[in-house]
Amino acid sequence: MLNREEKMKKILGIALGLSVVLTGCSKPEAPAADAAKTDTAAAEQTVTIASTGSDADIWRHIATLPETKAAGLKLDIKNFTDYVAMNTAVANNEVDVNAFQSYAYLVAYNEANTAKIAPLSTTYLEPMGIYSSKVKTLAEFKNGATIAIPNDGANESRALLLLQSAGLVKLKNDFDFVKGTSKDIVENNKALVIKPIQMATAVRVKDEVDAIVLGNTLAMEGGLNVLKDAIYYEPIDQTTKMNINVLAVAEARQNDPVLKKVGELYHVASVGKYVQEHFGGTKIDVNKPVSYLTQAK
């Protein structure tokens, strides 16, 4: 027969066993699916992108893609109208990335500012073109014809290089692709009048001159397709690699793994299809390492 102490031990053992069984059968506090959702939400990282015009449209589209969600990213697109302000915002970490500029423009910004920015990745090249409502070919330009070009730093230099590529002028051998101006023209056989203007006045001025050099964004806003409407446009080769557009970040964040994912998103197939459908082939995809650009300096 069991004594009193042994009976108590047996009762406690049975009680503990029942406790384990009941605990094992109890309902979990949160279903596994809910926990997974919580983990996914926690892992999603918001990246702010400063952009403008057609670039902003592209990034708003990218923000909706399943590839963006799969990368664990949420893109917040901020609209800007001032180019310098977009670079300043990136340099000061007020936004994470900006999307609007060529590599040449980025270099020019860094030369003029203390807080530096850096290319994160390449995106596309938009050829700059020469447009005219008065002539249909380069050969038709008369002596003394006036050609309007952008007056803003790197774009002015780029326009002059385009005129040289077209055979209309010749520039000095050490022409600066960032700071070059019309003063650097050493040969101008047709005595062309090169007129730097503010691009904000381009639409008004277009019919007042014999021709105008436009970047693709302004051309598209005016209903022009550089591949169809320009009488001449930039070749896509080693001579124009500085004109490739880039995503820009603060210099210290150039190798940020989260931001690198943003650069990769631009080159997914569905983005290429969207760009082709909406911009008539005028934004030519360039998926090159950043080193491809820096070697061009």
Can you name each region flagged by the protein language model?
Residues 120-169, 272:
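A conserved helix-loop-strand patch within extracytoplasmic ligand-binding domains
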Residues 127-138, 243-258:
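A bilobed periplasmic-binding-protein/Venus flytrap-type ligand-binding module shared by bacterial periplasmic
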